[in-house]
Amino acid sequence: MNIHEYQGKDILRKFGVAVPKGIVAYSAEEAKQAAEQLFAEQDSPVVVIKAQIHAGGRGKAGGVKLAKSPEEAHEIASQMLGTTLVTHQTGPEGKEVRRLLVEEGMNIDREFYVGITLDRATSNNVLMISTEGGMEIEKVAEETPELLLKIQVDARFGLQGFQAREAAFFLGLEGEQFRNAVSFITALYNAYTSIDAALAEINPLVVTKEGRVLALDAKINFDSNALYRHKDFIELRDISEEDPFEVEASKSNLNYVRLDGNVGCMVNGAGLAMATMDMIQLAGGRPANFLDVGGGASPQTVEEGFKIILSDKNVKAILVNIFGGIVRCDRVAGGIIEAARKIGLNLPVIVRLEGTNADIAQKMLDESGLNLIAADGLKDAAQKVNQALSA
């Protein structure tokens, strides 16, 4: 689960992670009042107005601006609120700006990158440090890997003092800046583990000319499987920032991820779903979604799955690929027939059913009178999808 920058900073602040003073604003008038308060409390000649959306690259898209007075903050907020911000992470449709973070200005000396996430290859948390703050860390890792330090942290023992110092040394810091960086990194790791985060990313981490070390930006992603331990975090979810198809799918406990292709996929099991998407791509099609109906697929979940797939106007054909282990193929077939009659499937539907009660399921589909295309094997299914698209 993703949250906004200001929410992430509020959480980090509770763990002793240094962040700038900031106030969230939902209107231009609130932005002006926030600026007045910050100007009264700080020496900086500017405040920063930051659009709050679940995407990076806001600065280049015009979502981060400086204001030298409360009146200018009001003007900037008026222009920014309600606009659609398009960045390299939002896609061409962009995201609407509904709230702003008004933050104290910083006298920046240097910018760095600090991030913590799980390294699935080693089953350890990994602390990532780079001298290239403000850059996309993937680009740094690919083009200048020598500027990125990765420190494996054994979850049994946590971040050790020598590891935090190694990170600060890598950044070339000395004296008070060095000590502040060590404290910052230690506090960030404690926050990351305490809240069951999947990612804690500070980009940039700034060192001011006064020697302060602060998180100028913060991105926190929660492990959704651990949210039952942090029920207070659930209220931080902003559904308006999420894909509406994915929100609707979550209501039916369907694992759905929207993609930009033209072939709707309904599969049971994440591994089979990934293989199905690969086969569609290899056959010349493009998957429009990842949809895992799970091991307990019922006629109701199949029907809901069809509704969500058909909500995407880019879908030109649908592939149903079910391997019946725990799931009975006849139950899935019943869901397909029921959904087809209720919804009115006007698109080509290719069905591949294997496993428990597959023969019964195929008979049900044959006798349904519906225009369903049977497939024998995954490769055959993918080829028939491509043929249907070409027809």
UniProtKB/Swiss-Prot annotation:
Disulphide connectivity of cysteines: none
Domain annotation ATP-grasp: ranges: 9-248
Binding site for Mg(2+): 203, 217
GO biological process: succinyl-CoA metabolic process; tricarboxylic acid cycle
Source taxon at top rank: Bacteria
Cofactor note: Binds 1 Mg(2+) ion per subunit.
PANTHER family per UniProt: SUCCINATE--COA LIGASE [GDP-FORMING] SUBUNIT BETA, MITOCHONDRIAL (PTHR11815:SF10), SUCCINYL-COA SYNTHETASE BETA CHAIN (PTHR11815)
Family: Belongs to the succinate/malate CoA ligase beta subunit family.
Protein name listed in UniProt: Succinate--CoA ligase [ADP-forming] subunit beta
